[in-house]
């Protein structure tokens, strides 16, 4: 049966240039596009491990519809040609782990702003549609966080719900280099918006709110550097797999809404296949029903991992650490992130489905199956003597 868009028109097969296709979100998007659509993907990245199962063997049902190009977009003259060959470019490439923002601020700013510039330019000059991945971090802190602790207004959604077309972007001072990422993302959003306004670029900007699931980041010492600090899902998974305490930064009081990657990818597919409804828009993509403090997240993950692995949890499963100890000088944090869903709901009729419990159970089952043996082996190896 021919695929139809939300307005009943049949969808023509597209060629998509996906930059950063080998990452967490890219791997899920490629999987969905191969399994459920006729679209072709030119997959650009410096790594391909997370999409290897889609590239080999050549007998796969979608062979010929996905092509990997090992390209660093910082310096590769093939970029423009690949964008020209495609109907649509999706840019996911970025440094996007908070441990880097204050320790490698230059790399962070270059990656999120400077390196994205040619992509925007080539799309604009060649009249190609662009879906660019920004972040919910562009909202920074909530207005409510500046009110007195006991102010009743803190409970009023007007002071914390984050709306694409109304909320301000509130970052800390320059010396808090945590905001280097958010600020670079904000500027590239403004540039894309301006290309749309002045030069007619067809664009959609996505602001993900803590998408999580299998293949997110890496487990230090197993499929990433031992000293590396991934995002919270992988940090907590790593501690659970090693039977270590989960570290709560500054007491784990910050709040987040987590969304299952598979729900979020449905929203991206709707954007891809409904350009008339998605062009010119900025979309929050999150799950406002899945809010927890980081401490609650740690408690839930501990309980679920115990169920999944059959191992009893530690007597004291968490430990408090200061942000300076954990991330170093210049760290700062978003206090609360509730996405307003009005625009995506109106334009694309999309809503998230999966509860936090269910998504953590699916994800931790994957983590256990994928890493438990490798961790056991690594931990039983004698430490090399100097
Ligand atoms: N996962 C989330 O919840 C989340 C939240 C907010 C924003 N985002 C944004 O979504 C995008 C994708 O995030 P992700 O979670 O998949 O991250 P990821 O780190 O898993 O994926 C990014 C990919 O981009 C590639 N890349 C980076 N620089 C490159 C370069 N110069 N040339 C070629 N490839 C390059 C990396 O190798 C990596 O595979 C990023 O822009 C990120 O800022 C993600
Ligand atoms: O995912 C998003 O929507 C955006 O937010 C993330 O930022 P953040 O949520 O702060 O990063 P996480 O590593 O997921 O941390 C969440 C919270 O857990 C805390 N944390 C993290 C790791 C840990 O071991 N312990 C711990 O308490 C952090 O301090 C933070 O308050 C990242 O910046 C991006 O991937 C993305 O743009």
What are these regions (language model features)?
Residues 1-211, 367, 386:
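N-terminal Rossmann-like NAD(P)+-binding domain of SDR-like oxidoreductases, especially those catalyzing
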Residues 19, 110-113, 181-182, 226-230, ...:
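Short, solvent-exposed loop/helix junctions and linker helices
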Residues 20, 24, 179, 207, ...:
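Amphipathic alpha-helical recognition patches that constitute DNA-binding helices
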Residues 22, 77-80, 99, 106, ...:
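Residues in well-ordered alpha-helical elements
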Residues 22-25, 142, 215, 253-254, ...:
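Gly/Ser/Thr-rich beta-alpha loop segments that engage phosphate groups in nucleotides
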Residues 71, 210, 240-386:
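C-terminal substrate-binding subdomain of Rossmann-fold SDR/epimerase-dehydratase oxidoreductases
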Residues 98-102, 214-222, 326-329:
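A short acidic, helix-capping loop that chelates divalent metal ions and anchors anionic groups
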Residues 144-161, 190-256, 261-272, 298-305:
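NAD(P)-dependent short-chain dehydrogenase/reductase
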């Amino acid at each position: 049966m021919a695929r139809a868009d939300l307005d009943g028109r049949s969808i023509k097969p597209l060629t998509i240039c996906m930059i950063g296709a080998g990452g967490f979100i890219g791997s899920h998007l490629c999987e969905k596009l191969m399994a459920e659509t006729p679209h072709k993907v030119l997959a650009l990245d410096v790594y391909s491990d997370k999409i290897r199962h889609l590239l080999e063997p050549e007998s796969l049902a979608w062979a010929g519809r996905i092509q990997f190009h090992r390209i660093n977009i910082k310096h590769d003259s093939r970029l423009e040609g690949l964008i020209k060959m495609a109907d649509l470019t999706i840019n996911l490439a970025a440094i996007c782990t908070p441990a880097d923002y204050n320790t490698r601020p230059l790399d962070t700013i270059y990656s999120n702003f400077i390196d994205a510039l040619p992509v925007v330019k080539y799309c604009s000059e060649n009249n190609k549609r662009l879906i660019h991945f920004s972040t919910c971090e562009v909202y920074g802190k909530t207005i409510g966080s500046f009110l007195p602790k006991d102010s009743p207004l803190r409970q009023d959604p007007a002071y914390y719900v984050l709306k694409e077309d109304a909320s301000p972007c509130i970052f800390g001072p320059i010396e808090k280099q945590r905001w280097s990422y958010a600020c670079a993302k904000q500027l590239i959003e403004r540039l894309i918006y301006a290309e749309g306004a002045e030069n007619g670029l067809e664009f959609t900007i996505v602001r993900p709110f803590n998408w999580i699931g299998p293949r997110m980041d890496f487990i230090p010492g197993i499929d990433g550097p031992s000293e590396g600090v991934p995002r919270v899902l992988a940090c907590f998974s790593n501690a659970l797999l090693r039977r270590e305490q989960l570290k709560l930064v500054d007491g784990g009081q910050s709040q987040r809404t987590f969304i299952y990657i598979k729900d979020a990818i449905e929203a991206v597919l709707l954007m891809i296949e409904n350009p008339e409804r998605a062009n010119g828009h900025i979309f929050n993509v999150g799950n406002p029903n899945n809010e927890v403090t980081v401490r609650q997240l740690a408690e839930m993950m501990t309980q679920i991992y115990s169920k999944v692995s059959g191992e009893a949890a530690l007597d004291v499963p968490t430990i408090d650490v200061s942000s300076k100890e954990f991330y170093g000088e210049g760290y700062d944090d978003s206090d609360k992130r509730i996405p307003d869903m009005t625009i995506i709901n109106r334009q694309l009729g999309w809503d998230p489905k999966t509860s936090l419990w269910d998504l953590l159970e699916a994800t931790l089952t994957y983590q256990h199956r994928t890493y438990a043996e490798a961790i056991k082996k690594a931990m039983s190896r004698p430490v090399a003597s100097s």
